[in-house]
Amino acid sequence: MLDIKWIREYPEKLDEALAKRGIEPQAERLIKLDLERRSHVAKVQSAQERRNAASKEIGQALAACDQTMAEHLRAEVEEIKVFLSSATTEEKRLTENFERALSTLPNIPLDDVSVGKDGSDNVVIRHFGTPAMFDFTPKEHFDLGQNLKQMDFERASRLSGTRFTVLSGALARLERALGQFMLDVHVDEHGYTEVSVPLLVRDEIVYGAAQLPKFADDLFRTTDGRWLISTAEVPLTNLVNNEILEISDLPLRFSSLTPCFRSEAGSAGRDTRGMLRQHQFWKVEMVSITTEEQSLMELERMTECAEDVLKRLGLPFRTVVLSTGDMGFAARKTYDIEVWLPGQGCYREISSCSVCGDFQGRRMNARYRKEGDKTLKFVHSLNGSGTAVGRCLIAILENYQQADGSIIIPDVLQPYVKGMRCITA
C-alpha cells in the first residue's frame, strides 16, 4: 500500500508513476476521499470531547444545585450520543471507501525501470549458456512425457479437470528431486532459513501480500473463508505481520517448497497443452525482509541465487528487467529469468524476483527499529521463485532429450534419484 502522506505532498509524482503503468490519474480522487474521511473524524473527535466535557459539567451543576443547567447539559449529551451513533457508521463507510481506493493502486516503479505497455518492452540484461543444437527435431515436454508413459493428462482431467497433470515413475521422482535440490541449495549455501508454512491462510494475510482485493478472482477460496496460497510468498512474507523487528535481526531470509494453487482466470486459451500453466504446481520460494537501505542489493543477491540453480542444472537462460507494463502489482522492480525451451524454440519465464519496497510492509504493519532510534520504519520485502519446479522439469525434459526420446538426468540431480542417469520408457 502507498503512503497517503506522500500522496498528499507529491500528488503529481503519483500520477506520473501511475501513467508509466498505463493508469489514469488518481491523486485528486484519493486526496478528496482522504479529506472527507479526516474531516469527519475531526467532527467525531470534537463531539466526543464536548460530550466528555458536558458530562463533567453536569456534576458541577448538580454540586451547585443548578438543576436547570444540569438538565440542559443532559439534553446536550443525549443529542451528541445520537450524533455519534450515526457518525460512527458514516466514519466506517468513509474509511472503507478510502482504503479500498488506496489498496487497489499498484506500487511505484523505480526510476530505472523502462516504461512499456507489455512484455515486448522488457529489457534483456544477460544470458547464460548456449541453446543446444539437436541433430533431430526436438519435441515439447508433453510429447516427451507421454511417450515415456509417465505424464498423463487424460487421467488428470478425469480426476480434476483441465490444467492438471499426473506424473508417475521416474518423472514423479525427478519432480520431487528438483524441489529438494533447489531447497538444499538455498538453505545450505545461500543462507535462507527453511520454513514449512500453512497452505490455507486468512483474508488479512492475502491482503498483506497485496493479492487482495485486486486478485481475488485468481485465487481459490474454501467454504470456510480461507484461501489456498498461490505462492509461498504469501505466508512467508506475513511471518512478520504486525511485528516490530530490531534492525540487527535483518535481513531475514526464508525459503519454502510448497504446492501453489491458481485459478488462471485470465489465462483462457494460453498454454492449454502440457504443464506450463497449471491450477496446482510445486515451487520453491525465496522471501527477504530487510531495510530500505539494503533492499536493492538484496534484489541482486536474490536474483543471483535463482540463477545459480539453473546454472547448476546446466540450463540456458536469460535475465530480463520487466517494463512497467509487465511488472507485478506490488513490485517496484522485477527481474524475470527465462529458461530456453528447445521444443517451443523460445525462452519462457521460470522465475521472477521482485523488490516491493515498503508496499507490503505497510499493509502488514510490519516495522523495524534502528538501534538508539525510537522511530519505527516499515520493513522492505522481496520475493523470488527459486524456482518453479514444474517449469524446471519441463526445461530438463526439453534440453536433455535424446533422439530416442530418453532423458539424461543432470549430474547434480543424480544423488537425489538414487544414481539414476537416464529416464526411458
Curated annotation (Swiss-Prot):
Signal peptide: none annotated. GO terms for biological process: selenocysteine biosynthetic process; seryl-tRNA aminoacylation. The lineage of its organism: Bacteria, Pseudomonadati, Pseudomonadota, Alphaproteobacteria, Hyphomicrobiales. Pfam families: Seryl_tRNA_N, tRNA-synt_2b. PANTHER family: SERINE--TRNA LIGASE, SERYL-TRNA SYNTHETASE. It catalyses: tRNA(Ser) + L-serine + ATP = L-seryl-tRNA(Ser) + AMP + diphosphate + H(+); tRNA(Sec) + L-serine + ATP = L-seryl-tRNA(Sec) + AMP + diphosphate + H(+). It comes from Bartonella quintana (strain Toulouse). Gene3D superfamilies: Bira Bifunctional Protein, Domain 2 (3.30.930.10), Serine-tRNA synthetase, tRNA binding domain (1.10.287.40). Catalyzes the attachment of serine to tRNA(Ser). Is also able to aminoacylate tRNA(Sec) with serine, to form the misacylated tRNA L-seryl-tRNA(Sec), which will be further converted into selenocysteinyl-tRNA(Sec). Pathway: Aminoacyl-tRNA biosynthesis; selenocysteinyl-tRNA(Sec) biosynthesis; L-seryl-tRNA(Sec) from L-serine and tRNA(Sec): step 1/1. Keywords: Aminoacyl-tRNA synthetase, ATP-binding, Cytoplasm, Ligase, Nucleotide-binding, Protein biosynthesis. Its main location: cytoplasm. Belongs to the class-II aminoacyl-tRNA synthetase family. Type-1 seryl-tRNA synthetase subfamily. It is found in: Cytoplasm. SUPFAM superfamilies: Class II aaRS and biotin synthetases (SSF55681), tRNA-binding arm (SSF46589). The keyword Ligase applies. InterPro entries: aa-tRNA-synt_IIb, aa-tRNA-synth_II, aa-tRNA-synth_II/BPL/LPL, Ser-tRNA-ligase_type_1, Ser-tRNA-synth_1_N, SerRS_1_N_sf, SerRS_core, tRNA-bd_arm. The keyword Ligase applies. GO terms for cellular component: cytoplasm. This is Serine--tRNA ligase.
